Amino acid sequence: MLSSTIIAALLAIGSALGSNGYGNTIDSRFDKLSDLTDKYTLYQVISQPDAVPAEATDNLVPSQPDAEPVEASLSSSESPAQEYSVKERCERYTMKNQGLEREYNLYRPEGLKAGAPLVIVLHGYGGSALKGKKAMMDVADKNGFAVCYPQGIKDPKGKPGWNVRYPSQEGMKTDDVKFLIALSKELQKRFDLSPKNTFLTGMSNGGDIIYLIAMRAPKAFKAMASIAGLQFNWMETEYSYKHPLPFMEVHGTQDHTSEWLGDPENKGGWGAYIPVPAAVSRIIAVNGCTEEYVTELPRREGRNQVTLYQFKAGRPAVKGGRPTEVWLYKVEGGDHSWSDKDMDTCSEIWRFFSQWID
């Protein structure tokens, strides 16, 4: 039970050993969770009775922030432009959805086998599919999967993105959750890609909508990875997490566009949202994870320290499947980016996704 195992471990100084995927043993003492933030532990879940099973929220205490978050910038940035090159390597396609012609770019490594896995990569707000993450194609070359970079629809201010009800998106009728599900089916059928092994990742606005999909359509993708994504308050007013799913989040503690500690008063202008640890805690709870491992990734010279929190032994997402996991990469001092100067982010995403391939 989550309440008896994890909460007790938070109060005790017990430890266990496990593998972190780097060939090392790691200490799984839960007292390290206090390092996540000085205001929120990962298991301090703000009350939402219908969102998670009752046994997953026993004894969890609502957090009370005692300080205002730093005002967020309205600008959204990604990694340097020279790291992005999709146009030269991808094929461009269109499809009809909700009365609109939608664009996407598809990369298939040479010699890709029929029924290969698929990873869909979502750009940030104001971004472009043609400036998608080049490194994911490099990982695809080594591991044999297809990569799709869809293009977001422009909002009334002319900024492309995914509809998560930013103030600038007011009046938009596009349902991007439905579009992304339809896109995955289009790709699977048209290009003979695996319906069982289709994954979703995205950065910033692309990560935001992943939280919404995790609530509305948790079975639509085999696993999901959000980079600098947010769970907005309105999402859990209308929806909740009701089904286990493998989930990963990468987030910098000095991200002043998507604040680690949240923005409950909407000072940043994107809409009110909860702290990142609180958002991830909801997904841990619905997964029913009972084991936790903490490790520091090898630190690159002159770069930020990355700590990986792995939550395991959850409820299987499919009957007879393996227990789910939730991974949180905390980038100490990290900004609003893919954090790929601090770690090999795309390889880490695939390392997580590849565990769930049938």
Segments and roles (model prediction):
Residues Q169-F191, L212:
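Alpha/beta-hydrolase active-site loop
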Residues T253-Y293:
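Accessory cap/linker subdomain of secreted extracellular hydrolases
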Residues Q151-D175:
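Cap/lid segment of the alpha/beta-hydrolase catalytic domain
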Residues L112-G158, F221, N233-W234, T257-E259, ...:
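Short substrate-entry loop that stabilizes the transition state in hydrolases
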Residues D344-D358:
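Catalytic active-site module of serine/aspartate enzymes centered on a nucleophile-bearing elbow/loop
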Residues K242-F247, R322-V326:
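Short, proline-enriched alpha-helix->beta-strand connector loops that line the catalytic pocket
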Residues T5, I13-P53, T57-L60, Q64-P69, ...:
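A domain-start/cap signature at the N-terminus of enzymes
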Residues E249-H251:
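Short beta-strand/loop motif that positions the catalytic acidic residue
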